[in-house]
Amino acid sequence: IYFKDNKETTFSAYYPYSKFLTDGKMNWNIAEVEANQPCKADVLFASGATASKASPTVNFTDAEHRFKHCMSLVEFKIKPGQGVKDNNYKFNSLNMKGIFTSGKFDTRTGSVETAGDRATLTRVFNDVPFESEESFAYIMLPQSLESNKMDIEIYLLLNDSEVKYTTPITPSTNGQFEGGKKYTYNITVKNTGITIEKANIVPWENGDSSDLDADIAL
């Protein structure tokens, strides 16, 4: 870094780097987290670190100026319960309804904005035997939810007949997914419906963690 005078300069930084910016903003799309793989949707931002000609080292490691997660991490742990476990059900798909799946990240300020319309995100399981817990997670855009909830649809197969279970998820953080937080939802699917335990929310450091029940759709 070259300093032309002795004035102190304030720095910001972001990750991952993108050379495709418009007015300092990069496009963003929701992505599933893959084990032991970096997720390009996990955007980090740091600001406020200073340096000068006399002290040229830029330090983003202290608590106040360290990198922070800008998006939300939403994790699902779905297991078979009474009437479903040991009955040869297969996991067909899961829908997350009414969410923004794309947006823009401002590399100068660290702010995030939604883009486009609300949509349904589908995760396909390709008829996986539903005998034990299935877990997966998505990096999601921080957002307010329509009517403060995200509807979940779970589709199981039994002897090639599809059974639909539904449940709403309402984040305790004012009905929205907040940036920098991890939300964990433990969902039990039973032949009478779905149970969701109380959500666990922690700074991502972490967000919600809850146990949920889903009702069978008639």
Q: Would you name each region that the model predicts?
A:
Residues Y14, K77-K79, N95, E153-L157, ...:
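Residue-level recognition of well-ordered beta-strand positions that form the cores
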Residues T114-R123:
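Conserved small-residue
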Residues I1-K90, V124, V128-F136, E178, ...:
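Short, low-hydrophobicity acidic/polar segments
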Residues F177, K181-L218:
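Intrinsically disordered, low-complexity repeat and linker tracts
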Residues D86-A115:
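Extended low-complexity, serine/threonine- and proline-enriched intrinsically disordered segments
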Residues P16-S18, T101, F105, G110, ...:
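Extracellular low-complexity Ser/Thr/Asn/Gly-rich intrinsically disordered segments
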Residues N126-S172:
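Extended serine/threonine-enriched, polar tracts that run as long, contiguous segments within proteins
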